[in-house]
């Protein structure tokens, strides 16, 4: 499969947005808020629940209550999704700031894929630096993915011909130097994950610093939400490099927004290999205890308005889920059918 970034914006225009809502339709996060597509009859929410001891895997439908725009909803179905096919996108930061930690990322990433992937699952691998490159397309082979991960290398060279998209397609930028993190998230979500079904997650191994992307963090968030993908940024950084260069390390804020809005979470591991392995283990545990809750909304009008979702499962549990959606007709609703 050969992909390019033809749907991405030119330097003079932002990416094509969703149909703009009328002023009265704008939700609490504004017109640029993330979109969770639904069908007319069903809203699906992937979520995890934790208490002080870790993830909780024993919840039943009657334990939870969901409200949409403060109106109670009747939960139609709630199941644990251990066996639903899983699609994983691994995004690997290969910019110069990752020189000292790339070997850790390669070792832990390959181990994670060996342990998680089953024959019904698929994963792909993207690297990003001054370019965004597809190192491995969808495959269920951990060995093939490991080979691709091990071929990743640090790239600090400048490009005079713009930044190529996935598969070598044009992705114009006015500043071809840097770390194209936001562009990579957009391309992974829009070009690779949006057309997939089942559970979808994106794991980003990065220091969280973006430099030179044509897109903004809000564009990356919107693309991830439209693809119905849960994003887990793993912040791995040799911060000493920043101090030695006289620069501030400020990578956590944008990644926190991306994780929160998509129902994922940020895991900060510094430059510690053991913590990185633990981070992957935490994500595995979360996938094994993830729930899919479905309800038929009382407001069945797919009018594009923002609907706030409040999910509570009591018992002092911390619920990790997206916070709402725009009711877009004909969109993906979670793929449980």
Feature map (PLM): residue ranges:
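Bacterial N-terminal signal peptides
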Residues: 1-2
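Scaffold/interface architecture of coatomer-like assemblies
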Residues: 5-337
